[in-house]
């Protein structure tokens, strides 16, 4: 017997019961994006490797350790995208979408990082991201955060996520802070682990993310980035906080919050949760005003975020399972006997025409009534339609509410109206 070929570790199959959950959540997210005027952009999964090195930073964990990079037959270095912002910016520059224009864009799809697989974090994972180009005020930063807050309310998880904010200032302000932080860390090298020692000179702000408790204790005495902000960044951040206060969105200023990618400036934010065990990030983003120019375009202000869908699905399942408890089908059509199958399929097609969006499944493969009703239960149907030879002859169909057990014979010409009443 041939050996079974299995999925690559950390790259998962999503089976029909799971994809139904994903589709419901994704549909909610897309509806909210549409209500804010955001448009979808579809991007390649594979990009030229230099794109990510220039955008993300060569001395980041993503570029150094996590990217899936390979040479194609022409000898070009290509990479499976580890995140979406760089590709979105590349597309905007390439197609002339950005200079002197406003764009509100979103994308969704798989990303790839060679990390140790764990719950909610995989080597192939899915993100939904939104990017705004051409607007530089704190009001658009606030709009993005308000948009995400509306998601949480729509998904019924608002009480289980909290917002953390920070400003990491301009490039110049961050450079001054970097020097002060390195000087502090050099005085306490005996407390640093090997990873922090390596980062101390290549990317010292990443030391602030260390999970080492000894390093975290040390950082309580470290310089604070907020003390090094330039006046424009300080004013921008104050404006953002004022807008969020007016909108009633609670937040915590976390002065250790930095982002893992080098292109960020000024606003950075994360939505975090404690409802999945240890604290985890659900959605994160910030401003990256220099990235378009860094990738060859003209200077363009930009801000955006990305959300990991695996972790979001886990959170919704954990705290609001009712949201995803929707049936696979609404109506199951039971046909009694081979002679009625053609009439059943004709009726099903007519109902699909008259009731767009209804999920209706017709029984195929025969079976007695007991087996067919068992299949209706398996698919989670609320209503069964029963069509036998007598119903075909007199133009009726039996409508059975599978929750209450009540049933009635209804003329086929008026069954759609009757079903709409039952389904609400």
From Swiss-Prot:
Source organism phylogeny: Bacteria, Pseudomonadati, Pseudomonadota, Gammaproteobacteria, Enterobacterales
Enzyme Commission numbers on file: 6.1.1.21
Key words, A-Z: Aminoacyl-tRNA synthetase, ATP-binding, Cytoplasm, Ligase, Nucleotide-binding, Protein biosynthesis
Primary localisation category: cytoplasm
Reactions catalysed: tRNA(His) + L-histidine + ATP = L-histidyl-tRNA(His) + AMP + diphosphate + H(+)
Protein name: Histidine--tRNA ligase
Biological process according to GO: histidyl-tRNA aminoacylation
Record Gene3D superfamilies: Anticodon-binding domain, Bira Bifunctional Protein, Domain 2
PANTHER family for this protein: HISTIDINE--TRNA LIGASE, MITOCHONDRIAL-RELATED, HISTIDYL-TRNA SYNTHETASE
A GO term for molecular function: ATP binding
PROSITE patterns given in the database record: AA_TRNA_LIGASE_II
Domain of life of the organism encoding this protein: Bacteria
Alphabetical list of InterPro entries matching this protein: aa-tRNA-synth_II, aa-tRNA-synth_II/BPL/LPL, Anticodon-bd, Anticodon-bd_dom_sf, His-tRNA-ligase, HisRS-like_core, HisRS/HisZ, HisRS_anticodon
GO cellular component: cytoplasm
Family as reported in the entry's similarity comment: Belongs to the class-II aminoacyl-tRNA synthetase family.
Pfam family, one: tRNA-synt_His
Localization in the cell: Cytoplasm
The gene coding this protein: hisS
Organism listed in the record: Salmonella heidelberg (strain SL476)
Assembly mode: Homodimer.
